Regions:
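"…together with the soluble PPM/PP2C metallo-phosphatase catalytic core" -> "…together
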Residues: 2-199
Length: 199
C-alpha cells in the first residue's frame, strides 16, 4: 500500500517543481529570444510570439524529483517502510536508469538547440535516432510484444522512440497540447501498472 501513497507524493512534488520552473524558463526564453514566431510553420496556430523552453521546465522538474528522492531515501523509508523491498530492485536497475536520464538530457539539449537555431530536419532525425539507439541498447527499454527476434525488437523500439519524439514535437502548435497529451499517456500507463500490480 505504501507505493500507492508514495506516488501521489512524488506527483505533487513534481507539480510544485514545475510551477517553480515554468515561469523561470518563460523569462529565460524571452531573454534569450527563444520564441515560437506565429505562422512560421504551417501547423502552428499561435496568434503572437510564444516563449519556448517548456520542455526544459518539464525536464528540470523530473531531474529535481530524482535528486530529491535520492537524497531523501531515509525520510522515505521512515514514512513509507513498505518501499524497502522495492528499492532493492531500483538499485539493481540503477545503471539503466542513469542511461535513461542521460538520454532524456540529450533529447532536451537537442530540442533546445533546435529551438534556438532551427536545425535541418535530417540532422535532427539523426540526433533522435542516436538517442533512441542508446536508449534501446543500454537503457533497458525494449518492445518485445509478439516479437521473438532481438534485432527486430531493437529496431522497432528505436522506431517507436523516434516516433514519440516527433509526435510530441508536432504537438507544439497550441499551448499546453503536448503536456496535456503526455499527461493522458501518463494516466494510461499508471492505470496499466496499477492493474498489473507493477510498481
Amino acid at each position: 500500500m505504501d507505493w500507492l501513497e508514495f506516488y501521489p507524493a512524488v506527483f505533487v512534488t513534481a507539480l510544485l517543481f514545475s510551477a517553480l520552473y515554468t515561469p523561470l524558463c518563460k523569462k529565460l526564453a524571452w531573454k534569450l529570444n527563444i520564441l515560437d514566431v506565429p505562422k512560421c510553420e504551417q501547423h502552428k496556430l499561435h496568434a503572437k510570439a510564444t516563449p519556448l523552453l517548456g520542455g526544459l521546465s518539464m525536464f528540470l522538474s523530473f531531474l529535481s524529483v530524482i535528486i530529491l528522492t535520492a537524497l531523501g531515501r531515509g525520510i522515505q523509508l521512515r514514512y513509507f517502510p513498505g518501499l524497502t523491498e522495492g528499492l532493492k530492485g531500483v538499485s539493481l536497475a540503477l545503471p539503466q536508469f542513469c542511461v535513461l536520464v542521460a538520454c532524456a538530457a540529450a533529447a532536451v539539449l537537442l530540442g533546445l538547440y533546435d529551438d534556438k537555431h532551427s536545425m535541418k530536419a535530417w540532422k535532427k532525425l539523426i540526433g533522435q535516432i542516436l538517442i533512441a539507439a542508446v536508449t534501446a541498447t543500454w537503457g533497458g527499454v525494449s518492445i518485445t510484444l509478439f516479437i521473438g527476434i532481438p534485432f527486430i525488437s531493437w529496431c522497432i523500439t528505436v522506431f517507436w522512440i523516434v516516433f514519440i519524439f516527433n509526435a510530441i514535437n508536432f504537438f507544439d502548435n497550441m499551448d499546453g497540447l503536448a503536456v496535456g497529451t503526455a499527461t493522458i499517456a501518463f494516466i494510461f500507463f499508471a492505470c496499466a501498472a496499477l492493474g498489473a500490480d507493477d510498481f
